[in-house]
């Protein structure tokens, strides 16, 4: 999926759209990327002399990745996905300008409109962040 297809699925726009491309998507798994550049607005304050992507934004990027997975299903087109929670979140590596964040999300449980995914973000094959994300699909 290119950026136009991602924008058709997600309501997010600059500066909050944190998925640049989807490399693969199946019924229960997705791989996407975020190219992190020094031009990201959050680097102005986090931190000016030592820019590091905020962990909460890495988790948001993972949530958006999972959202694309859910909203790529025909029955969910035009709906919204709402973050409902995160658990077992771990940050293992700093993400800095020039990094390419490779994000994966895999469904592990679904009940009605609630879904749970295992999500991972890696840079150069090394784990940067992971967690279990819960979200709801609604109108």
From Swiss-Prot:
Reactions catalysed according to its record: a (3R)-hydroxyacyl-[ACP] = a (2E)-enoyl-[ACP] + H2O
Class of enzymatic activity (EC top level): lyase
GO biological process: fatty acid biosynthetic process; lipid A biosynthetic process
Gene3D superfamilies from the UniProt entry: Hotdog Thioesterase
Keywords: Cytoplasm, Lipid A biosynthesis, Lipid biosynthesis, Lipid metabolism, Lyase
EC numbers: 4.2.1.59
InterPro entries: FabA_FabZ (IPR013114), FabZ (IPR010084), HotDog_dom_sf (IPR029069)
Gene Ontology MF terms in the entry: (3R)-hydroxyacyl-[acyl-carrier-protein] dehydratase activity
Localisation: Cytoplasm
Active-site residues annotated for this sequence: 46
Pfam families documented for this protein: FabA
Keyword Lyase part of the UniProt annotation: yes
GO cellular component terms listed in the entry, alphabetical order: cytoplasm; membrane
Family: Belongs to the thioester dehydratase family. FabZ subfamily.
Job description of the protein: Involved in unsaturated fatty acids biosynthesis. Catalyzes the dehydration of short chain beta-hydroxyacyl-ACPs and long chain saturated and unsaturated beta-hydroxyacyl-ACPs.
Protein name per the record: 3-hydroxyacyl-[acyl-carrier-protein] dehydratase FabZ
Species: Streptococcus pyogenes serotype M1
Gene: fabZ
